């Protein structure tokens, strides 16, 4: 059987699955059509997923796990597969975890065979995968060790390429391909210092590596050995690396003479781009280079904050609102982040507030209109910074609203799930207040059951919004949430387990949502804390322990019974879920939940929410998405 064809089918199904999970509104005239489209799409996703799992289970995994060495044909097939999973050209990664295990097997085989050129090829593939995984996991500030793992692997591979670039070793390389791989990846190694914050030693090392690579381009030893190598591109990309050392509001903490050097290199990049704009415009737009130059002039104190702001606004107003590649993401998401950073330094005027409000809307509209197959990875990377630099102010957009609209724009089923959990938890809480108000002591400052009854509406409001925010952390791992085509790997389960802590951290950044952080942090913990995650959080120490238990139950109930957004799986019935609660009473679930869910009034209300209520949520989601779809970006 032609496994090339099978792997190509896997790729095409992945693309279909991603598109089906967040369908376009084109051709949908009514909310009922949207609901049907989603249901049909997820049935189709289930079929596509089964076909992809068969390819992995019957062909790829047995090959990767075999003790036998790969044949030349097998290595070629999975090498081609890995390249298609990581498509750097359009900043899109279709399945990084699978690409990682494929590249590791290829590298392992090449080391055993001792052949240098195949080894270099697969080191090249492996370093690209490491970089993509580092960027993917660098969004998770609360878990630096995850990105650190891939950073270290990438740096070790980079050091191997750098050692081969030394003149004595480089001369021994027998082919132009081997030499090109060494030059390219020794240069690329500096990229593994990205996303480090305030590490002065790393900043010094990064600059030293860049200077060394620049010297290579001016050394006749290398240029004469490689006369056909694109030295112009090599030099341009190095200048690009220099210019990005102050990326995202200079998070790396470059300072003093470093900033001066970076600025001067940015000016070189600007001049080089304009020396042959026809050639370089095929790499990046002029505005991309202009934004880098303006930022580095500002940090080198060669441009005032006001002048930098004006330049950013000029670039933003002239942006291409429908450009969905790296340059488009820079113009439409990164430039607003830099403007947010400036607003933190300059007094927030009414004009600033209006600007921030407009930027918030435009970024969400841009994300909503982004095709599912374009630049998802780079969009999520910049969106993570957007959320962490977001500014709240009275009368402006609240973080909760921003987060929910982002979920709606990128993955409607997760948005509907958040609202369903809020409806279920609030419904259960209302009945709990009536029957056992003492369980809510501690919520909204209540010190007695009588106060709980008096503050009934305030407590329900709290539960509603806390539940809406329970999955906040998922906004930074949407590419893992998109994985429907196969079972999650251990690495992906690890990423999923980060979302409570990441969500709590994001919520704590903003006054309007800080009080919901414990619910986000604890909603995957068992009632008795014997299982669940994060392990270090003991929910019994939280004053909102009962709300955590309500949301945990509501979360499990919606996930178990949803047959629209999760129709690729068979949903449980409400009675089956209640039996599960009885079985786990006092361990997984709060002991009072079993009795509460057994009451006829509660069962009737919850049953309504799981049927008509869920349909209404999809109707409302359609209306919200349609309003974004129909309104032009400003």
Region spans (language model):
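Amphipathic alpha-helical repeat scaffolds of TPR domains
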Residues: 6-22, 28-90, 115-141, 171-196, ...
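Helix-turn-helix repeat elements of alpha-solenoid scaffolds
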Residues: 7, 23-58, 85-110, 141-168, ...
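Intrinsically disordered, glycine/charged-rich C-terminal tails and inter-domain linkers
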Residues: 9, 13-29, 44, 350-362, ...
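Histidine/acidic-rich helix-loop-helix segments that form or flank divalent-metal centers
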Residues: 171-180, 228-232, 441-467, 507-553, ...
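Extended, non-transmembrane interaction/recognition domains
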Residues: 267-283, 287, 294, 298-378
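Acidic/His-rich, divalent-metal-binding segments that scaffold phosphate/diphosphate chemistry
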Residues: 361-494, 537
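An active-site-proximal "capping" alpha-helix that borders the catalytic cofactor pocket
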Residues: 419-430, 492-508, 573-593
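Short, charged, surface-exposed loops that flank catalytic or proteolytic processing sites
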Residues: 487-488, 565-575
